[in-house]
């Protein structure tokens, strides 16, 4: 079952959320990663922090994105968590390790990482498509963001670090 901030989801409690509502705010890949973050036989606590963590993870992973135009085999050792009762959290841990190798910059390591992600339906868009989705869903305009950056820099220049951190 799914809980909403540690409270069981129920129509009577009014804490039911529709996937269509989430898709307005989050990319489908964020939903996918959130759902796979807990083993299918365990309860899932659905909350804003989970979604934000998954969003940040995918943002980080997309920084390593390269198009893969050749067939790359995923090593059995990397797939072992999925062989073990479809342990998706274990496979996500493998993806984090592959990411650590990929971020060192070697093309081959990046291709292995991207292929392993695509195997479970992640990183299926180009970096440009991913960034465009995020821009479309920003609550701040580009001018608002630039103004906040300017305000933050001014606060830092005045050594008002508390204000600068708040603006960030």
Model-identified regions with their sequence ranges:
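Basic helix-turn-helix/winged-helix DNA-binding cores
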Residues: 2-3
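Structural preference for alpha-helix termini/caps and helix-kink/transition segments
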Residues: 7-168
């Amino acid at each position: 079952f799914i809980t909403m901030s540690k409270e069981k989801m129920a129509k009577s409690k009014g804490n039911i959320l529709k996937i269509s509502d989430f898709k307005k705010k989050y990319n489908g890949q964020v939903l996918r990663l959130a759902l796979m973050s807990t083993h299918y036989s365990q309860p899932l606590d659905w909350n804003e922090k989970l979604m934000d963590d998954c969003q940040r993870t995918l943002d980080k992973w997309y920084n390593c994105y390269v198009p893969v135009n050749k067939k790359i085999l995923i090593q059995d050792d990397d797939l072992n968590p999925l062989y073990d009762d479809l342990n998706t959290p274990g496979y996500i841990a493998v993806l984090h390790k592959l990411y650590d190798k990929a971020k060192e910059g070697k093309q081959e390591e990046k291709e292995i990482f991207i292929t392993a992600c695509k195997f479970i339906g992640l990183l299926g868009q180009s970096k440009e498509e991913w960034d465009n989705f995020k821009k479309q869903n920003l609550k701040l305009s580009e001018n608002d963001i630039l103004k906040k950056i300017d305000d933050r820099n001014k606060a830092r220049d005045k050594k008002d670090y508390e204000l600068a951190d708040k603006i960030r």
